[in-house]
Structures are given as C-alpha cells and as structure tokens.
C-alpha cells in the first residue's frame, strides 16, 4: 500500500529561545485563506524516484520559502501518513527571518469552473511558534513530528 502512495518530504526548522520554537507556513490559496487551526504546515512537497527524500526536503524548503534551508545536520523524525501521502520530515536547528521569505507560487482555476487560472503563494505567511502553539495550528497528520521533536 505504501509503495502506491505519493511521497512528500520536508524540513521542520526549530530554534531554542526561552523555549523550543518551530517554523511553520500557513498554506496559501483560497481554500486556506480564512482558516487558522489545521492550516499550518512543515515546508514540504512531493518528490519522485529521481531524488532522495532528503534532497526533496531541501529543494521543497527553498521552493516554498524562497530561501535555502540553513546549514546544519538533518535529524530524521520519521514518517507519517496524511492526505493520501507518506510524509518524511527532518528536524533542523537554525534560524530564519519570516520577513525574508519570498514564497513560491502555484496556479489553479479560480474561481471554480471559471476557466481562469490564477496564481497563489505556496504559503501566505511564515511564523515561529512554541511547540504547544504549533500543535494547535499544524495539520493534524503532521502533529506526530512535533511530538517526536520534543521527545529528542
């Protein structure tokens, strides 16, 4: 079953301030515009057989945020299933200014059945959250990655 599922990979950037914080992106596009809880995600995306999951995670981080992932050692947080995909995520300690993010874009027909393509940002904002706050914001299928990060 897993072999037939789409695969996605991403990087959960974290930093230590007065507490452990993680960087999440609010999903872009009209479906997510007015949603908050469950509308934030690890920067991630799909990949094929032509790259490793780690390569895909680094590529997707840069595509979604417009900045390369900070230098450092990726620590695998394992896999989780969500939205018909198997998601592999790595933790990376580093810092990033959310104001420096220039997200990539995607196109979709909007309004529906209009025949018109419109461009939307992959993520419409990026923010640091405490793990507790992030747990309430993140897509539920990705919550295990927060739990695994704090268990380390």
Name the predicted role of every residue range:
Residues 17-20, 29-32, 48-49, 83-86, ...:
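Short, charged/polar surface micro-motifs in flexible loops or helix N-caps
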Residues 118-124:
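Non-DNA-binding regulatory cores of transcription-related proteins
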Residues 2-41, 90:
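N-terminal strand-loop-strand
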Residues 127, 131-152:
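Charged phosphate-binding loop/patch that engages nucleotide di/tri-phosphates or the phosphate backbone
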Residues 78-115, 127, 149:
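Active-site-adjacent beta-strand/loop module that shapes the phosphate/pyrophosphate-binding cleft
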Residues 34, 50, 137:
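Residues that scaffold the ATP/ADP-binding catalytic core of kinase and kinase-like folds
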Residues 41-75, 130:
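The catalytic Nudix box helix
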Residues 5-9, 85, 122:
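Short, basic and Ser/Thr-rich N-terminal targeting/leader segments
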